[in-house]
Amino acid sequence: MFQLTRRSTIPKMRKWTALLGLLLLVQPLFAQKDKREPLTEPEIEQIREAGIVPSQRIDLYTKFLNEHADTIKSLTARKKTDARAQHLDNELQDFTALMDELGSNLDTYSDRHADIRKALKPLSESTDRWLSILRALIGEPSFDLARKEAIESGEDLADQAKRLLTEQTEYFILHKDEAYQERAEPKSKPDDK
């Protein structure tokens, strides 16, 4: 009788082990699916193509952020539903991720002394518009955290853009020979002979 029970238990354990193994293999696929990408593939390709031209890259990020801001604004006028709240939460998270990514790019371009003044002016104007849209959005429990993070990120980006515009204006007054360059080129030193 012991063997009969043991024989019937082993196949059941194998089935459970196989099921558990399958679940462990499938779980990472669901985790990857949940990771949101704030840009579409064509937008990512445009960013890549503009990769070596800082002002174009900033202009593209500004354009894509304007599109997200318009989407957020259009969602605020819709009837309050769970689907709307989820869509707003996703858009706000994407918006924040893009602003943070743009901020990182600005840091890099600033360190290189790339002349990005032309792109900073429209960015600075846009950040004011984005913040007014975000502040006008009445928070709901399902997306209030994302809204607050977007406002904080927007304020940081607005401050950064204005500060960089001032710094760059002052820098290029002193370094006129470097103005309008995508990155500061090292100056050649005369050979000491």
Feature names for model-found ranges:
Residues 10-11, 18-19, 151:
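General helical structural elements
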Residues 7-8, 20, 41:
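Helix-centric, low-specificity signal for extended rod-like, repetitive segments
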Residues 8-9, 16-17, 185:
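Small/flexible residues
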Residues 32-193:
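Long, charged/polar, soluble alpha-helical segments
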Residues 1-13:
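N-terminal secretory signal peptides that target proteins for export/translocation
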Residues 14-18, 120-121:
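Short, surface-exposed loop and linker segments with low hydrophobicity and enrichment for Pro/Ser/Thr
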